[in-house]
Swiss-Prot record:
One of its GO terms (cellular component) is nucleus. Signal peptide: none annotated. PANTHER family: SERINE/ARGININE REPETITIVE MATRIX PROTEIN 3-RELATED, SERINE_ARGININE REPETITIVE MATRIX PROTEIN 3. Residues 257-278, 291-313, 417-433, 466-476, 488-507 have a biased composition (Low complexity). It comes from the Eukaryota. Residues 99-109, 530-549 have a biased composition (Basic and acidic residues). Residues 1-47, 99-597 are annotated as: Disordered. CDD domains: cwf21_SRRM3. Residues 149-158, 168-186, 199-211, 219-243, 384-412, 550-565 have a biased composition (Basic residues). This is Serine/arginine repetitive matrix protein 3. Expressed in breast cancer cell lines.
Length: 597
C-alpha cells in the first residue's frame, strides 16, 4: 500500500500542476481529471494506511494491556519475576499473532489487515513496528527470544485460561476504575457543587443585592440578613460605636459608596436600609428603593403620610431642631435655608404635627423644637407645608421617610434629644454654616448635634458619617432627615449642592441611621444614643475634622447620590416630585441644579 501511495503521490507531484500531490487551481484544465483520478486511486491506500497504523497501535495497546493483566495476575498468584516475564512474553507473542490474524479477522478492519501483505507472523516493512519475529519474539518486547520459543506451547495451551483470566481482571480494573471515577466524579461534582454553590450563592447574593436595591421585598431580605449579621454587627457596632468605628467594613463599603455612614447606619438599622450598604449607586438606589420601600412601608404608617414628619422625626427630633431650629434658628443656612427650612420646617412641623405620633416615637422634644419652629412655620405655611409635606412624604417615603421615621425614633431613644436639638440646631447651623461653608466650627456643633440630637445617629454616623460626613450627615441628616434637609440643601444654593449631596447621603444615612435607630435600637441605637451622646460629642469633636472631610466627601458623594435619586431612572415620580417639591419649597428649581450638578 505504501508503495502504491508513494507512487501515486510521486506521479501526482510529477505533474507540473500538482504540488504536494494536490492539483493547483492554476493548473491547466487538461491536468485536472488526471490529478483527481490519481487522488481517488491514492485515497484508498492512504485511508488503509492510516487505518492500519491506527489498528496496529490499538492492537499493540490491547496486547500490552492483556500482558499487564497477566503479569498482575501472576504476581498475585505468587509467581517469580522470571516466570512472570517468560509467561508474559509468550503471552504477548501469542497475542500479537492472534491480533495479526485471528483476532483481526473477527473485528472490523480485520479484513484490511488480512488484505495487507502482513502475514500472521510477518511484519510489513512499512509499518511502524514489526509485531514480532518468530525467533526473536516481539520486537518491542524486552524479554529474550528463548522465552517466547520455550513458552509457545504453554501460550497456546494456557491461552484460553490466561486470556480468560485477564479479561476478568480487566473487568475488575474497570470496575475499580469506574468506582474510582464515580467517586472522583462525586467528589468533583461535590467540589463543583460546592464551588458552583458558592458561585450560585454569590450570584444569588448579587441578584439579591440588586433586588434589594430595587425591591422593598429585597430590603426585607436584607433586613433579615442584616438582622442575623446585625446581631454580630450590633455587638461589633456597640463596641465599634464607642470607638467610632461602628462597622469599618460597612464604612468601607458604604463609605466607598459615599454613603458609608448611611450604609453603616443602614446596615445598622437593617439591610433594608442597606441601600446605603449597597455600593454608592446601589445605596442611592437602595435609598431610593429604601425610601420608596420605607415610603411604602413607612408611608403606610402614619409617619408615612408624614414621611417628612418621619424625616422630621430624624431631622425633626435632632435634625429638625437642628435643621429647623438650626436653619431657621441659627440662620447659619442662608435666609433661604431658614425660610425654606422654616417652610419645610413648617411642612415638616406640619408633617410632624400629623406625624407627631410617629415623631412622638422618635423624640417629641426635638420634634417640639422643630415643631415649635415649624409650628410658626406651620401657621405661616400650613397649606404650602402640607403640599411640601406631601411631596416630602413622597420623598421621605421614597428616600427619607423610613430612615427619618427611624431617625425620629432614634432621637426618641436618644436622651440627647435636648442636646440633639441644640446639637442638631448647632449642627444645622454649623452644618448649614460650616457644613456648607464653615465645616471647621460647624462640624463640631453639627457633629455634636449629630452626636447629641443624632447622638445615636451621630455616633453611628460619626464612624460612618465622619468618613462620609458625620456632622454634615447629622446636619445633612437633619436636612436630609427632613425635606428641610433637601430644601435646605437646595435652598442654600451653593451649599445646597453640598448639603443636598451631604444631605442625600445624610438622608440616606439619617434614613439608614434613623432606620437603624429602630433596628439599632434593637441593639445599637439605644446603646448608640447613650454611647453616641457620650461618645457622640467627643466623636462629634473628634469627627469634626473627619466630619468636615466626610461632609465634603458625602457632599461629593451625595450630589452623585442625589442625582441618582433624582435620576428618573430610579424613582422618577417620587424623586422628581420630591426633589422638585423640595427644590421649589426650599429654593425653587435653582437648588436642584446644584444637587444634580
Amino acid at each position: 500500500m505504501s508503495s502504491t501511495v508513494n507512487n501515486g503521490a510521486a506521479s501526482m507531484q510529477s505533474t507540473p500542476d500538482a504540488a504536494n500531490g494536490f492539483p493547483q487551481p492554476s493548473s491547466s484544465s487538461g491536468t485536472w481529471p488526471r490529478a483527481e483520478e490519481e487522488l481517488r486511486a491514492a485515497e484508498p491506500g492512504l485511508v488503509k494506511r492510516a487505518h492500519r497504523e491506527i489498528l496496529d497501535h490499538e492492537r499493540k495497546r490491547r496486547v500490552e494491556l492483556k500482558c499487564m493483566e497477566l503479569q498482575e495476575m501472576m504476581e498475585e498468584q505468587g509467581y517469580s519475576e522470571e516466570e512472570i516475564r517468560q509467561k508474559v512474553g509468550t503471552f504477548r507473542q501469542m497475542l500479537m499473532e492472534k491480533e495479526g490474524v485471528l483476532t483481526r479477522e473477527d473485528r472490523p478492519g480485520g479484513h484490511i489487515v488480512a488484505e495487507t501483505p502482513r502475514l500472521t507472523e510477518g511484519a510489513e516493512p512499512g509499518l511502524e513496528y514489526a509485531p514480532f519475529d518468530d525467533d526473536d519474539g516481539p520486537v518491542d518486547c524486552d524479554c529474550p527470544a528463548s522465552c517466547y520459543r520455550g513458552h509457545r506451547g504453554y501460550r497456546t495451551k494456557h491461552w484460553s485460561s490466561s486470556s480468560a483470566s485477564p479479561p476478568p481482571k480487566k473487568k475488575k480494573k474497570k470496575k475499580g476504575g469506574h468506582r474510582r471515577s464515580r467517586k472522583k466524579r462525586r467528589l468533583e461534582s461535590e467540589c463543583s457543587c460546592g464551588s458552583s454553590s458558592p458561585l450560585r450563592k454569590k450570584k444569588k447574593s448579587v441578584k439579591k443585592h440588586r433586588r434589594d436595591r430595587s425591591d422593598s421585598g429585597s430590603r426585607r431580605k436584607r433586613r433579615h440578613r442584616s438582622r442575623s449579621s446585625k446581631c454580630k454587627r450590633k455587638e461589633k457596632n456597640k463596641e465599634k460605636k464607642r470607638p467610632h468605628t461602628e462597622s469599618p467594613g460597612r464604612r468601607s463599603h458604604r463609605h466607598s459608596s459615599g454613603s458609608s455612614h448611611s450604609p453603616s447606619l443602614s446596615s445598622h438599622y437593617s439591610d433594608s436600609r442597606s441601600p446605603s450598604r449597597l455600593s454608592p449607586k446601589h445605596r442611592d438606589e437602595g435609598r431610593k428603593t429604601g425610601s420608596q420601600r420605607s415610603s411604602g412601608s413607612r408611608s403606610p404608617s402614619p409617619s408615612g403620610g408624614s414621611g417628612w414628619g418621619s424625616p422630621q422625626r430624624n431631622g425633626g427630633s435632632g435634625q429638625r431642631s437642628g435643621a429647623h431650629g438650626g436653619r431657621p434658628g441659627s440662620a447659619h443656612s442662608p435666609p433661604d435655608k431658614p425660610s425654606s427650612p422654616s417652610p419645610r420646617v413648617r411642612d415638616k412641623a406640619a408633617a410632624a404635627a400629623p406625624t407627631p405620633p410617629a415623631r412622638g416615637k422618635e423624640s417629641p422634644s426635638p420634634r417640639s423644637a422643630p415643631s415649635s419652629q415649624g409650628r410658626g412655620g406651620r401657621a405661616a405655611g400650613g397649606a404650602g407645608r402640607r403640599r411640601r409635606r406631601r411631596r416630602r412624604r413622597r420623598r421621605s417615603r421614597s428616600s427619607a421617610s423610613a430612615p427619618r421615621r427611624r431617625g425620629r425614633r432614634r432621637p426618641r431613644p436618644a436622651p440627647p434629644r435636648g442636646s440633639s436639638r441644640s446639637l442638631s440646631r448647632a449642627r444645622s447651623s454649623s452644618d448649614s454654616g460650616s457644613g456648607r461653608g464653615a465645616p471647621g466650627p460647624g462640624p463640631e456643633p453639627g457633629s455634636e448635634r449629630g452626636h447629641g440630637g443624632h447622638g445615636k445617629r451621630a455616633k453611628e454616623r460619626p464612624p460612618r458619617a465622619r468618613p462620609a460626613s458625620t456632622s454634615p450627615s447629622p446636619g445633612a441628616h437633619g436636612r436630609r432627615g427632613g425635606p428641610e434637609g433637601k430644601s435646605s440643601s437646595r435652598s442654600p444654593g451653593p451649599h445646597p449642592r453640598s448639603w443636598s449631596s451631604s444631605r442625600s447621603p445624610s438622608k440616606s444615612r439619617s434614613r439608614s441611621a434613623e432606620k437603624r435607630p429602630h433596628s439599632p435600637s434593637r441593639s445599637p441605637s439605644p446603646k448608640k444614643p447613650l454611647s453616641r451622646d457620650k461618645d457622640g460629642e467627643g466623636r462629634a469633636r473628634h469627627s469634626e475634622a473627619e466630619a468636615t472631610r466626610a461632609r465634603r466627601r458625602s457632599r461629593s458623594y451625595s450630589p452623585i447620590r442625589k442625582r441618582r435619586r433624582d435620576s428618573p431612572s430610579f424613582m422618577e415620580p417620587r424623586r422628581i416630585t420630591s426633589a422638585a417639591s423640595v427644590l421649589f419649597h426650599t429654593t425653587g428649581p435653582a437648588p436642584l441644579p446644584p444637587p444634580a450638578a
